[in-house]
Amino acid sequence: MTSSKHICMFAAENDVIPGAKVGGIGDVVRDVPRALADDQTRVTVVIPAYGAFHELPDAVSVGTFTTSFRGTPQRVEMYEVSIGRDNNVRYLVLHHPLFAAGGKGQVYCDDDANQPFATDANKFALFSVAALSAITSGNIDSVDVLHLHDWHSALTLALIRFDTAFESLKSLRTVFSIHNLALQGIRPFAQHTSSFQAWFPHLHYDSGVLADPRWPHCINPLACAIRLADKVHTVSPTYASEIVQPNDPLRGFHGGEGLEEDLQQAATQGRLVGIINGIDYPAESAVRLSWQKFTLQLSEELLSLIVRQNTLRTVDYTAHQRVLAEAQRKRPAHIITSVGRLTDQKMALLFQSTRDHRTALECILESISGRGLFLLLGSGDAELEEQCQQVASRYPQLVYINQYSANLANLLFANGDLFLMPSSFEPCGISQMLAMKDGQPCLAHSVGGLRDTINDESDGFLFKADSLNAQAEALVQRVNDVLHLREQKPDTFTRIASAARKKRFEWSTSASRYHTELYS
């Protein structure tokens, strides 16, 4: 690079800041700036303070400015959070009472089904205009590239296009990253307190540029960003090729989620780019523990989580007791692990019925009875949590841990034999990379980033089929085949595990492509 460049990122999450991560976007916003920053590049990352992060011990006030929202001036405070020693990376949080609408420190709100995204849309509409005002007021200086993440910051592109207050920002290069295409932030144009005209009553705009392709009376922030950004970025090449196709529920295929025509146009114009995410690699790999040490650490970590809660939940007690019981036995022949948020995306195939009316999860559990253990770590959707708990009550070979902690996840990554990731769709995925890093091969659905990171029977295992039922059947069959391989050809399985451990998804490689394919 021949000249200095300043990249400014707007996002809803940033895992550098304690408590500011909910999903995978927080990991990416944590890691990408560090990989990008060098002597020629500085990066500024901006998120809302959510009523909490401006109060962190390392947060220092660095400015106050006003922005226009709902037709009135709004005072916004800006704080810099100094965490770690990230040269040429600056972390900012914006404070305004509306950003704490869901409660102090709550990143997202859970609105009623009859008004989806209403509270979050208010919050992120203000965040979008406030973050832009931080630039035009001089509180963030000399920006060259504006990099936006998901629908939460997508409205900034509409404001740059139609609000004369941001006329000076039209020369900025803009990049929009899609981490979750299913969440689009759709709201009415008008006649609601959470609507585009309620937020920006002074604006004269072209509704055709901003409208949802299915509901023309609604604004779709994600569609708007896809149409207006200089580059549209997805977090894997295969996912970029999938989302230009329409969804096909009968085939169990997740594509463009209604925005495929906009994405097709972006692809035709050369604006759609797929770049795989990366992970960090420590100097030394995690050490695989003996069965006694593993179960001891697992039970201790579980107990520490339990004692922090006000009440003892049945699901936690059951998991802890099951781990204690397993500690008294020999190590099972096979330890299957899975780590992730409990969402339809991650769990639908496990609960899909097979031809004998059992779910795929039940079939897998019955196939490992007496010879294996399935350790499932995750929380999320309440109905899915209940389903997992019910299955665990019937199958002692399932240890369902309805929690999340990095320590528990790392224990499972480092000590399992086969990592299961049967996502219905997967923009990139990070859990499979973390398991592979520790030498645990992954068995995954051949979609999106899973297909891009796993080579079947070389460093992991893939399955695919053309309907939901067939996908569930293929998942069960593949698990059985892999466990049979592990029993009958242990040298082959060990070779695959070794290849998984050696595979690398370096952020430096991805960052180089960011510079050449997104920012130039």
Predicted regions: what they are:
Residues 1-520:
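Catalytic cores of nucleotide-sugar-dependent glycosyltransferases that transfer UDP/GDP/TDP-activated
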